[in-house]
């Protein structure tokens, strides 16, 4: 009973901030919503009736289609179906301004937002096994409210979905072949890991690197379970050729091949030129502009954490070290490494699961530093996410030149608080108060008797 109460409180602690602010408008989320509206209102994936609100599209044989991988749309479909039915029952046109706002808000929260919150339960169990219950919870709050996972859980992007699926896959692998120690050699867990990784790739093609690294890890530990993992990945991976076929009639024709509004995508392999850039790497890791460690200093604890990880498992050490490094090198040579209007290095989202485990190990060793860094991460990333997760591309000093002036001017976007009549900074009061109460209750609900 105590475990169930804890799980419910943890879910609420995350879903509340994920749902509080109205999702901001942008090409990335609009193109996926266009597909959902087209499928449910017109029975087609062609977005001809909606395409003018996005630049993330291609034109093929006189029709417009989303250029994005299909996975996020599939994940979001159940939530959209529910809100579409409710809007219909209330005689609200889903394509009207009000209908669009309601459907986007609800769909975002109960697709990528809910997936992220559920994955936190899996990560908690994984971290608790190798640290302690309290360290695991501090790490959960830091990762899910103080990193890119929070930022992209409030919009219909692919990044939080991919990170969440990889986290569930890591938990499943730990119960299959074992992550830091020997596993249970559970076939169903290896199949689950495969399903999550296949869906990860179907959400974001570049996450194939992280998925491939995990496949090699499982293959190294147990060939039979690597086959189970591959079998589990087949069904979700079929979403990719199905989407290609529905658009162009060819299962091998990826929509990115026909993107014209972003000329950088024509360079190299879909924009990746395999020319590592040290300056860009710094921007991706340490700068105000897109720095992963600047906005999420809790992840710096992965540095001492890797030392402890080496002592626990050399194979896991190399997995969690090399995967982020290779991803960093590749993204540094990507034409759009900055991610356009964004907060943080969104193209590195798929490496977060590989950093949060060693960061939790570091937090377990340096508990006071862990709490301080977790609080700082939540403050910085939370500030940016609440104010404007789609920060202007041209602002290089986001904190000092963009977010702090927004706070000083009281410029706050629409939220549940503003719908209740609260204005400016006061509109955030329910978010902060209820979040603090939920986090406190979650902390008190931990069953420390199961601590490692």
Regions found by a protein language model. Name each.
Residues 36, 139-140, 144, 150, ...:
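Membrane-interface alpha helices of multi-pass inner-membrane proteins
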Residues 48-61, 245-309, 392-432:
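Membrane-lumen/periplasm interface segments of multi-pass, membrane-embedded glycan/lipid transferases
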Residues 215-219, 293-316, 355-361, 367-375, ...:
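Hydrophobic, aromatic-rich transmembrane alpha-helices
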Residues 8-13, 143, 195-197, 234, ...:
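Transmembrane alpha-helix segments characteristic
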Residues 151-161, 291, 344:
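Short acidic/glycine- and proline-prone juxtamembrane loop motifs at membrane-interface regions
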Residues 175-179, 209-242, 303-313, 357:
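Perimembrane helix-loop-helix junctions
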Residues 2-9, 88-98, 118-145, 163-164, ...:
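Transmembrane-helix signature of polytopic, membrane-embedded enzymes
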Residues 142, 161-181, 189-197, 354-358:
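Specific aromatic-rich, kink-prone transmembrane helix
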């Amino acid at each position: 009973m105590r475990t169930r109460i804890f799980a419910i409180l943890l879910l609420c602690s995350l879903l509340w901030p994920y749902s509080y602010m109205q999702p901001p408008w942008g090409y990335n989320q609009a193109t996926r919503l266009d597909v959902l509206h087209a499928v449910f209102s017109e029975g087609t994936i062609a977005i001809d009736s909606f395409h003018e609100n996005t630049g993330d599209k291609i034109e093929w044989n006189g029709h417009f289609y989303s250029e994005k991988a299909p996975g996020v749309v599939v994940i979001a479909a159940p939530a959209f179906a529910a809100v579409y039915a409710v809007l219909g029952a209330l005689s609200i046109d889903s394509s009207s301004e009000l209908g669009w706002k309601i459907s986007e808000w609800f769909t975002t929260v109960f697709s990528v937002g809910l997936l992220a919150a559920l994955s936190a339960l899996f990560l908690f169990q994984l971290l608790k096994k190798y640290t302690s219950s309290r360290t695991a919870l501090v790490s959960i709050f830091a990762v899910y409210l103080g990193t890119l996972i929070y930022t992209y859980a409030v919009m219909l992007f692919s990044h939080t979905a991919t990170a969440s699926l990889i986290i569930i896959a890591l938990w499943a692998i730990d119960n299959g072949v074992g992550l830091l120690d020997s596993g249970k050699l559970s076939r169903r867990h290896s199949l689950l890991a495969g399903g999550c990784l296949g869906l990860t790739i179907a959400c974001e093609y570049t996450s194939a690197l992280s998925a491939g690294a995990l496949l090699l890890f499982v293959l190294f530990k147990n060939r039979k379970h690597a086959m189970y993992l591959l079998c589990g990945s087949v069904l979700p991976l079929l979403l990719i050729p199905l989407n290609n076929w529905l658009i162009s009639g060819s299962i091998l024709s990826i929509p990115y091949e026909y993107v014209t509004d972003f000329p950088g995508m024509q360079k190299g392999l879909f924009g990746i030129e395999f020319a590592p850039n040290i300056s860009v790497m710094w921007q991706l890791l340490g700068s105000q502009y897109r720095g992963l460690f600047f906005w999420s200093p809790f992840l710096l604890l992965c540095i001492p954490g890797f030392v402890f990880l080496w002592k626990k498992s050399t194979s896991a050490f190399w997995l969690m070290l090399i995967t982020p490094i290779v991803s960093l090198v590749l993204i540094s040579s990507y034409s759009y490494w900055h991610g356009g209007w964004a907060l943080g290095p969104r193209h590195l989202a798929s490496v977060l699961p590989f950093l949060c485990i060693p960061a939790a190990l570091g937090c377990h060793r340096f508990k006071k530093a862990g709490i301080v860094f977790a609080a700082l991460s939540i403050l910085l990333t939370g500030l940016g996410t609440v104010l404007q997760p789609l920060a202007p591309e041209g602002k290089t000093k986001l904190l000092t030149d963009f977010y702090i002036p927004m706070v000083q001017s009281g410029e706050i976007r629409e939220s549940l608080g503003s719908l209740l009549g609260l204005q400016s900074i006061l509109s955030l009061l329910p978010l902060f108060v209820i979040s603090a109460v939920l986090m406190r209750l979650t902390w008190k609900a931990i069953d420390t008797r199961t601590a490692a």
